[in-house]
From Swiss-Prot:
The keyword Hydrolase applies. It comes from Paramecium bursaria Chlorella virus 1 (PBCV-1). One of its GO terms (molecular function) is hydrolase activity. Belongs to the peptidase C59 family. InterPro entries: CBAH/NAAA_C, Ntn_hydrolases_N, Peptidase_C59. Disulfide bonds: none annotated. Pfam families: CBAH. It comes from the Viruses. Gene3D superfamilies: Penicillin V Acylase, Chain A (3.60.60.10). Keywords: Hydrolase. This is Uncharacterized protein A284L.
Length: 279
């Protein structure tokens, strides 16, 4: 469970941020630095969100039941899912580069504990111009590329399915309230409020299309934190059952991070400390 969004301010500043949710105590995360690439990763540096010196930002998101990886290829570069983000950040300057490189890659299976299967992943890519694309491994190890005009992202199902659902939902949603209603906010009646990826995508689409565009870099970061606050998950409200122990496993927002592509600053807050900090 994760939610991501890009905002472009009037002064041209591009900021992109995300929440990260995962089963409690399953994965740990820390600051990542590799040359000119900075971000947040697992201690081994494999599950990475990061930005390079060109302002290219790549986020990895969970893609359960939909990621389809291939067998080793003789004609393409074989790469593991946990290697994709760092490889692209090392090789590409912008979305155009990523699109070209993606055609040369064959994403193959790997063993990566604590996952019992190859980690199912897809990727959100944003560059300094504000262009955004999605990479999804939908068959035979090939990465399918989708343009992402709203710069929003969650998890499964596929990106085209999300966009179709969002398009239909937005036809019936508005920021304008009924003037005769007893409460403000009636224009958004029907906006889904649950934590499923499909519902979160629709909420992101609504925010993307209705928020007041910030004027400055600082305003863009501030606005994006306000939006992502709506996707923050406190421990207890989302849970599953561990089939081996019978105990609840909780999902919570481990961290929220924002990359300011103009200033190259990275700011974040985590579950136990809601104060915004520089990475």
């Amino acid at each position: 469970m994760c939610s991501g969004l890009r905002i472009i301010a009037d002064d041209g500043t591009v900021v992109v941020g995300r929440t990260l949710e995962f089963g409690e105590n399953i994965l740990k995360f820390k600051k990542f630095v590799n040359g000119n690439i900075r971000g947040i990763s697992t201690p081994d540096g494999k599950l990475l969100d990061g930005m390079n010196e060109h302002g290219l930002v790549i986020f990895v998101f969970y893609f359960k039941n939909y990621a389809k990886y291939g067998c080793p290829s003789q004609t393409k570069l074989n790469i593991k899912p946990t290697e994709v983000a760092l490889f692209l950040l090392q090789k590409a300057k912008n979305v155009k580069d990523v699109k070209a490189i993606a055609k040369t890659l064959n994403v193959i299976h790997e063993s990566y504990p604590p996952f019992t299967e190859t980690p199912p992943m897809h990727w959100l890519v944003t560059d300094a111009s504000g262009k955004s694309i999605v990479l999804e491994p939908l068959g035979n190890g090939e990465l399918t590329v989708f343009d992402n005009p709203m710069g929003i992202f969650t998890n499964a199902p596929t990106f085209p399915e999300h966009m179709e659902s969002a398009k239909k939902a937005l036809e019936h949603l508005s920021p304008i309230s009924d003037p005769n209603a007893a409460s403000q906010g009636t224009g958004a009646l029907g906006l889904p409020g649950d934590f499923s990826s499909a519902s979160r995508f629709i909420r992101l689409a609504f925010f993307s299309q209705t928020i007041e565009i910030p004027r400055t870099s600082a305003g863009a970061v501030n606005t994006l934190f306000h939006v992502l606050n709506n996707f923050d998950i406190p421990k207890g409200v989302v849970a599953s059952i561990n089939m081996n122990t019978g105990k609840h496993v909780y999902e919570k927002t481990i961290y929220t991070v924002i990359y300011n592509i103009k200033s190259k600053e990275i700011v974040f807050k985590h579950y136990n400390d809601q104060n915004i900090q520089k990475l």
